[in-house]
Amino acid sequence: MDFGKFAATYIEELKTVLDGFETNRFIELINALLEAHAQGHRIFIMGNGGSGSTASHFVCDLNKGCCLDLERKFKVMCLNDNLPSVLAYANDISYESVFVEQLKNFFEKGDLVIGISGSGNSENVLQAIRYAGANGGKTAGISGYAGGKLADLVDIPFVARVDDMQKVEDVHMIVVHMIMQAVYAKLHPYNATGKPC
């Protein structure tokens, strides 16, 4: 196998996906995050597998990276990070309910719920999104391929339109880091670089 050729092909394919970047949805997502921050609403983010690690990373970047030195903090929770809770709900109820059951404890009207799913069809993510939408929340989805059910269900759908899970996840992490830097710059107008540590 020619690994150099493989790398070049992978990068070119990723560039093609990024050429179709959904800028308007990206802006909507940033504005929803800033609105939740300004109004003191909670933000819940979740995913499975690689999307779960992206969700966890996203929460860290918002909670620490964007507002460490600000008086008003983000209130962000990753629903896949509390492993004992996830396992308890999965064991005693169903894996499909692991996120929605946590929302029932913490969610309040006006909160923002973000689901990350490569396929857009993860049922546990969809159940949580449905609950949030039915109870006065704002919802966003970050998915891939053609968007899946998630894209049709949320208020703000961002889709990385490529039929390759790894490239979908690549784009999702790029979106997370772009959001972090954009939000940081908005909340730190005195910092000319706009780049968090």
Question: What do these predicted regions represent?
Answer:
Residues 19-39:
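A short, well-structured juxtamembrane/interface segment
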Residues 105-106, 110, 166-197:
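A charged, well-structured terminal subsegment
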Residues 35-107:
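Glycine-rich, small/polar surface segments that engage phosphate groups of diverse ligands
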Residues 1-20:
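Generic N-terminal amphipathic, Lys/Arg-enriched alpha-helix
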Residues 51-56, 121-128, 150:
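Short glycine/serine/threonine-rich phosphate/pyrophosphate-binding segments
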Residues 142-154:
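Short, glycine/polar-rich helix-capping loops at beta-to-alpha or helix-loop-helix junctions
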